C-alpha cells in the first residue's frame, strides 16, 4: 500500500526527494494550493518526477462523507477512510473575533475558526460522560488523516490560504495514546499549513507518564488537562484512567510542564449537576491548582443518548466561575457550540454510513 504524501514532514521529504528543494515546492502545492492530483503540479515538476510521485505516494486517504451545520454556524464533519471505510468526526467552530487597528484604534470585527480534530477512531480511556467511548476503540489515526481533517474542512469552506486556524486535539481519542502521530501532525500543521504551535492545543485525560515525553518534544503547543473532579473517588467514577494516574500524579507532571511567560496550562472541568458543581468543589479545585499557572475552562455537560448525567444550570456554573475568579484563578465558561447537531464536547463517535446521521 502506498504511503500518503501527507504523512511526511518537510525534513523527511527533503531527505527523500532529489534535489531536496523539491520538498518545499511539493509542500506549497499540497498545503497552499490544495492540489489533489500530482498531475496538477506540472508547472513545477517534470513528467518523470510526477510519474515517480504517482508510483510511490498517494494523496487523499479520507473523504468527507457527511456534513451537519448548526444554527450557530459550526459544522460537524463525518470523514470516511478510503482504506478501511471506518468513520470518524471533526468539528469546525466559528466564532466572532475582534481586533484593534493599531493605527486608528478602531474595533475590527471578523471571524475566527477552530478545527476540533480527532486522533483516534474510538477511544480506550472510557470516560463515562463521553459518547465516543460507547463505540469502543478501533484504531489510531495516522498523521495524514489528522492533517487532512483540517485541510479538507478549510478547502470545503473556501477559507483563504492566509486565514489562520486554531487546532484543538479535543475530538475522538486520547492524543497521548497516539503521541508519535499527533506530534508529527503538529509539525506538519506548522511547516505545511503555517499554523503556529501557539494556536494548537493538545488535550489529555491525564496519561501522566506521557506528559513529560510530550514536553520533551519542545513543540510549543498549549496543554489542556481534562480534570473534571476534585477528588479521586469522583474522578475514578468518571474516568477509569484515574485509577492508574490519580489527580496528584497528573498534577505533579503538570507542574513540570515548560510554560512561556504569560502562558497557562488549561484545566477542563466538566460540570455535572449535583456531582461536581458545588461551591465546595470550587474551593477544593482552587486548593488543588495552587501554585500552578493555570486557567480553568468550565464545560456544562452535553447530554447524549443513554447518558445518566444531567446538565447543570448556567446560574450554578456562573457561581462556580465567579468564586474562582474572585480568588485570582482565571476561569471561563465555555460556550457550548453545535449542541443541536451533537458536535459539542463529548458528543462525537464513529458512525456507520448506513445509519441515520
Swiss-Prot record:
Name used for this protein in its record: Dual-specificity RNA methyltransferase RlmN
Please share what else the UniProt entry notes about this protein.
Reaction proceeds by a ping-pong mechanism involving intermediate methylation of a conserved cysteine residue.
> Which cysteines link up through disulfide bonds?
116-345
All residue ranges annotated as the Radical SAM core domain in the record = 109-340
Q: What residues does [4Fe-4S] cluster bind to?
A: 123, 127, 130
The function of this protein is: Specifically methylates position 2 of adenine 2503 in 23S rRNA and position 2 of adenine 37 in tRNAs. m2A2503 modification seems to play a crucial role in the proofreading step occurring at the peptidyl transferase center and thus would serve to optimize ribosomal fidelity.
- CDD domains, sorted: Radical_SAM
Q: What gene name is listed for this protein?
A: rlmN
